[in-house]
Amino acid sequence: MSEKETNTTSTENKEKEKQEQTNTNSTTESTNNQVDEEYERPGRSEGLDEFGIQLDIQQSDPNSPLYSVKTFEELGLKPELLKGVYAMGYNKPSKIQEAALPIIIQSPNNLIAQSQSGTGKTAAFTLGMLNCVDPSINAPQAICISPTKELALQTFEVISKIGQFSNIKPLLYISEIEVPKNVTNQVIIGTPGKILENVIKKQLSVKFLKMVVLDEADFIVKMKNVPNQIAMINRLLPSNVKVCLFSATFSMGVEELIKKIVQDPYTSIRLKRQELSVEKIHQYFIDCGSEDNKALILSDIYGFISVGQSIVFVHTIATAKSVHQKMVDEGHSVSLLYGKDLTTEERFKQIKDFKDGKSKVLITTNVLARGIDIPQVSLVINYDVPLDEMGKPDPVHYLHRIGRVGRFGRSGVALSFVYDQQSTNKLMNISTHLGVPLKELKSSEIESLDGILKGIRNQLTPLNN
């Protein structure tokens, strides 16, 4: 598939899209019968696809130069970081890294960056954070805010690996993990509540801060109280702090919130709408006949599948627990992960067991829909059609869910369950919205999934992005 990049500059972003503001402050009822509150909040999608190639780059300052790089050496990275990059197996910058890294490292501009899932966004901003740090100053100099503990942990691990040859000390800053009162670590990675609360209380110093990153920014800015907290923090930050927002999608209703966070001058890197493509992911749906039959169909699927690992996404914690128990009773090796009620230690153990291959199936809510990179996952099952908090079809979460396969250009399979006309209509609404046709898989054809997955696994080769 061909790639090309279009650079344009303008004095202001003239594209004004219709926005539909959603209610992010709705209350959560009982734990089991509701969606996983920690992660089911954003509104409906703009329809921006994670898997397009072409980027649209715009700047608020037309006099600021635009350029990209083709090698990591061109960036003037510190030698110890360049060594860390190559130790990670990166030979050359990916598309988003080519465009974003010069802005992060060499430009004074703030950054809003959108690119498809699995293209190296994390490596882009972690390199930028590490490169701005002065190791001789024992104080926070770069902060990354992630929406979930699992994503924060993954980012912490990437930073630790890329920075392994430096004297930079990263710190995982989340609840239930003890942190020092006087933080001397230069790079902080954590969740919104923990970081924002302690910055406001001045328990986390921002005196030497140079860079703030919001990962999965479209979700974070719509979390309860976060925009107000960020506005308060902006008044505490040094004037020269660079703010970088990254996401694979941008939901409707976030533009005004983003403008409160990212000040001029800024550069915006977005997917071109006409470049929508999800051809690397084979997408199917199966009519289970009734809601009760969904568990039986799932059992049949895992009776045939013998290759790789998979993630099963459900809508509520109660469903997650029920599906998990049924699969355990049938003798499957299964992990269970959701946001509420599980301790941080339990959550990290579940994701580690799955990443280490101790379990082959992970049952989860949308808490794991964004950002998590598990290369051996070749199948995603939407046990429940993804819905927003209003019960409407949610293309954004659909994209993020199926984005757990097809990482870094690999192939994968996404299978969605429907069981009546209403669930079918909701899934078809997502399909139409994204312009992506879904093939029907008959229950009599379930056995063919194993052959499809084996073919995909045989195609996998190590990728250097």
Curated annotation (Swiss-Prot):
Record-annotated Helicase C-terminal domain positions: 297-449
UniProt keyword annotations, A-Z: ATP-binding, Developmental protein, Helicase, Hydrolase, Nucleotide-binding, RNA-binding
Catalytic activity entry: ATP + H2O = ADP + phosphate + H(+)
GO molecular function: ATP binding; ATP hydrolysis activity; mRNA binding; RNA helicase activity
Positions contributing to ATP binding: 115-122
Biased composition (Basic and acidic residues): 1-20
Helicase ATP-binding domain residues: 102-268
Annotated motif Q motif, positions: 70-98
GO cellular component assignments: cytoplasmic stress granule; nucleus
GO biological process: poly(A)+ mRNA export from nucleus; positive regulation of gene expression; sorocarp development
InterPro entries: DEAD/DEAH_box_helicase_dom, Helicase_ATP-bd, Helicase_C-like, P-loop_NTPase, RNA_helicase_DEAD_Q_motif
Motif DEAD box mapped to chain: 215-218
Enzyme class: hydrolase
Annotated stretches, region: Disordered: 1-45
Record EC number: 3.6.4.13
Composition bias type Low complexity, residue spans: 21-34
Family named by the database record: Belongs to the DEAD box helicase family. DDX19/DBP5 subfamily.
Domain remark from Swiss-Prot or TrEMBL: The Q motif is unique to and characteristic of the DEAD box family of RNA helicases and controls ATP binding and hydrolysis.
Job of this protein: ATP-binding RNA helicase required for normal differentiation and development.
Name used for this protein in its record: ATP-dependent RNA helicase ddx19
Organism listed in the record: Dictyostelium discoideum
Originating gene: helC
